[in-house]
Amino acid sequence: MTVLHSVDFFPSGNASVAIEPRLPQADFPEHHHDFYEIVIVEHGTGIHVFNGQPYTITGGMVCFVRDHDRHLYEHTDNLCLTNVLYRSPDRFQFLAGLNQLLPQEQDGQYPSHWRVNHSVLQQVRQLVAQMEQQEGENDLPSTASREILFMQLLLLLRKSSLQENLENSASRLNLLLAWLEDHFADEVNWDAVADQFSLSLRTLHRQLKQQTGLTPQRYLNRLRLMKARHLLRHSEASVTDIAYRCGFSDSNHFSTLFRREFNWSPRDIRQGRDGFLQ
């Protein structure tokens, strides 16, 4: 597995924060690094496989990666990221207690993926731009300024995470997308889902298409197919069983959609013919 080292990304040995844009981010194999990062999804779509679990990522998603996490990007489509790298929560010169603002693992579950709305994403970009402007400065005031900006970034993300922000339709759409990640195998009635998240059906269709480039049903089908591909690679369940577990009532229809999406049949994936290394 590829290991990325801080010496290749941080501007100096005492720099606590570094900005690494990926515009765009191409497919990238599984890797980990000796630093932490906050991945800000600017726009586009892709699959982020995080510690073996696939997540569909779109604009407005924020991913918190620790130094022992492993992850990869695949099936990217105009995916643009800004990575905010930091050495460790306890490696800041002027800040302490940052860990309290970061996602916390509970009962083996780590909430690594958050969503923020468009207006918050704009504020995030402004903070990141200010940090970038100061990257070449190594004096104490500049270091302190960068760390203060990093603290402001964490506070903004914390306050604006979907759990705390349901004031507008964009935030409710983000909550809906997170709900789909957990309920992709359920039979989805879009009228009922729109009501559940206080959205009109027309607004749901329009905003989901704007954010993901896909219609709601197309997005759901892709999400189900991604989950199915993961199970084909990492479980012993039959193709038929996986189809049912991922929300498809007809395994033949599942196989047709699967081949159309990935250009490989479910059996090809199961046998590793796509070249994926497990």
Swiss-Prot record:
GO biological process: positive regulation of DNA-templated transcription; rhamnose metabolic process
SMART domains named in the record: HTH_ARAC
CC terms in the record's Gene Ontology section: cytoplasm
PROSITE patterns hit by this protein: HTH_ARAC_FAMILY_1 (PS00041), HTH_ARAC_FAMILY_2 (PS01124)
Taxonomic superkingdom: Bacteria
Annotated ranges, domain HTH araC/xylS-type: 174-272
Subunit structure: Binds DNA as a dimer.
Name of the featured protein: HTH-type transcriptional activator RhaS
